[in-house]
């Protein structure tokens, strides 16, 4: 059976998410990936990716485009990266961001500081046999994970990957670099 994935397409690395999910779904007939710009675009989706970008901008645009409540109430799985991790939290250290409260966790924006402090590292992620090349770009970290949240990866700065039910959130960018293992883990989790 096909899987329908939407990518919130207001700002950020939308094209990279669409390409990664298309590749991850290539062997699933009837699957599709589409950009999401309006509330009605969420209908019939199995999953939604909330991309990296600027969390304050995405938060503002979600409100302006009438997407905040529909995304907060979305019943499918959510795959959130970088700014998406910030938005998916229930508590954020920046009052300019209106969190969606999809995952009970506290997130600190831009925990890595300036762009120059961004980095790549080989990261041990629970459930993966081999380390994952994680690209951190002005990344957030979760400073606290609530009840029912499975911490999948940590670095000295904090928690950088979590799962909560059918939702997954990452401080880094799994859509960059061609390693689709986390996309596949997420898609398999939709079937549970």
Swiss-Prot record:
TM annotation in the entry: none
Annotated keywords: Glutamine amidotransferase, Hydrolase, Lyase, Pyridoxal phosphate
Keyword Disulfide bond: no
SUPFAM superfamilies: Class I glutamine amidotransferase-like (SSF52317)
Gene Ontology annotations of biological process type: glutamine catabolic process; pyridoxal phosphate biosynthetic process; pyridoxine metabolic process
Cysteines joined through disulfide linkages: none
Catalytic activity: aldehydo-D-ribose 5-phosphate + D-glyceraldehyde 3-phosphate + L-glutamine = pyridoxal 5'-phosphate + L-glutamate + phosphate + 3 H2O + H(+); L-glutamine + H2O = L-glutamate + NH4(+)
Alphabetical list of PROSITE patterns matching this protein: PDXT_SNO_1, PDXT_SNO_2
Coiled-coil region: none
GO MF: glutaminase activity; pyridoxal 5'-phosphate synthase (glutamine hydrolysing) activity
Domain of life the protein comes from: Archaea
Residues the entry annotates as binding L-glutamine: 53-55, 109, 137-138
Family membership: Belongs to the glutaminase PdxT/SNO family.
PANTHER family for this protein: PYRIDOXAL 5'-PHOSPHATE SYNTHASE SUBUNIT SNO, PYRIDOXAL 5'-PHOSPHATE SYNTHASE SUBUNIT SNO1-RELATED
HAMAP family with a match to the protein in the record: PdxT
Subunit (UniProt): In the presence of PdxS, forms a dodecamer of heterodimers. Only shows activity in the heterodimer.
This protein's name: Pyridoxal 5'-phosphate synthase subunit PdxT
Organism of origin: Methanoculleus marisnigri (strain ATCC 35101 / DSM 1498 / JR1)
